[in-house]
């Protein structure tokens, strides 16, 4: 399989684990918080949905508009695996940037899932149809430890971010006080 096939498979895989983790939850389960400073399933799902569109726009409006610079490829070698590892490590907490912070008034399950599915479909369609080489366009991640990423790695970041917060949803569901129904 090509790199693009791998990216699509990863996006489809993270979509499935997220949908499986949120399937069939009651309103009480959806809004349950293990502690006042912890996110509910609703807040995690909304953050995933908002982030998907935000990062996709960053890829299409900023990363892909940077001039192709194949000479920069050495800067990002080995970061594919690093992105996946870093994002799945839940021992390192991060604070969501204000536009992606769901704490105001969480969306309903239907709203979050609809937004997520629409955004994910656009991301997958872009990967399948763009004629540009995703490995030739670069943009710096705001977290210095991550640094410069190519467009392909930004796509991996979308999927890894979904998986990270799906793990967070599973943590919420594993809480002993999580409603039985």
Which role fits each region the language model picked out?
Residues 1-16:
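Short N-terminal segments immediately surrounding and downstream of signal-peptide cleavage
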């Amino acid at each position: 399989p090509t790199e693009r096939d791998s990216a699509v498979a990863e996006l489809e895989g993270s979509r499935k684990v997220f949908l499986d983790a949120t399937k069939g939850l009651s309103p009480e389960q959806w809004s349950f918080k293990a502690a006042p400073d912890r996110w509910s399933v609703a807040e995690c799902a909304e953050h995933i949905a908002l982030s998907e569109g935000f990062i996709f726009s960053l890829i299409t409006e900023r990363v892909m508009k940077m001039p192709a610079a194949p000479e920069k490829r050495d800067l990002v070698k080995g970061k594919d695996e690093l992105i996946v590892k870093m994002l799945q490590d839940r021992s390192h907490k991060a604070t969501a940037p204000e536009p992606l912070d769901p704490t105001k008034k969480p969306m309903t399950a239907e709203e979050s899932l609809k937004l997520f599915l629409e955004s994910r479909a656009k991301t997958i369609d872009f990967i399948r149809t763009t004629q540009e080489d995703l490995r030739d366009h670069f943009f710096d991640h705001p977290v210095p430890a991550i640094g410069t990423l190519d467009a392909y790695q930004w796509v991996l970041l979308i999927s890894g971010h979904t998986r990270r917060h799906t793990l967070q949803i599973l943590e919420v569901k594993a809480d002993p006080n999580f409603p039985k129904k």
